[in-house]
UniProtKB/Swiss-Prot annotation:
The gene is minE. One of its GO terms (biological process) is cell division. Belongs to the MinE family. Pfam families: MinE. The keyword Cell cycle applies. Gene3D superfamilies: Cell division topological specificity factor MinE (3.30.1070.10). It comes from the Bacteria. The keyword rRNA processing does not apply. InterPro entries: MinE, MinE_sf. Prevents the cell division inhibition by proteins MinC and MinD at internal division sites while permitting inhibition at polar sites. This ensures cell division at the proper site by restricting the formation of a division septum at the midpoint of the long axis of the cell. SUPFAM superfamilies: Cell division protein MinE topological specificity domain (SSF55229). This is Cell division topological specificity factor. NCBIfam families: minE, PRK00296.1.
Length: 86
């Protein structure tokens, strides 16, 4: 029987499992934002405005994230998807 099981197609994860995984990602992201300093939303907006001064990008093309470690270390991560040059 195990030989036949080898040839069977693997089952897709259920929609409930997919929804649970997505929800866990959202909750983790919101927890990270909750621990951010009070000035972070304004700083994030100002960084995006400066980038838009020089490069035409949409809000969905700029990602600013603040990660904090237990060692009292903060990392500001900035990802910008630049448009292709013509």
């Amino acid at each position: 029987m195990s030989l036949l099981d080898y040839f069977k197609t693997k089952k897709k994860p259920s929609t409930a499992a997919t929804a649970k995984e997505r929800l866990q990602i959202i909750v983790a992201h919101q927890r990270g934002e909750r621990d951010a300093p009070d000035y972070f939303p304004q700083m994030k907006q100002e960084i995006i405005e400066v980038i838009r001064k020089y490069v035409k990008v949409g809000a969905d093309q700029v990602s600013v994230q603040l990660d904090q470690n237990d060692d009292n270390l903060s990392v500001l991560e900035l990802n910008v998807t630049l448009p292709e040059q013509s």
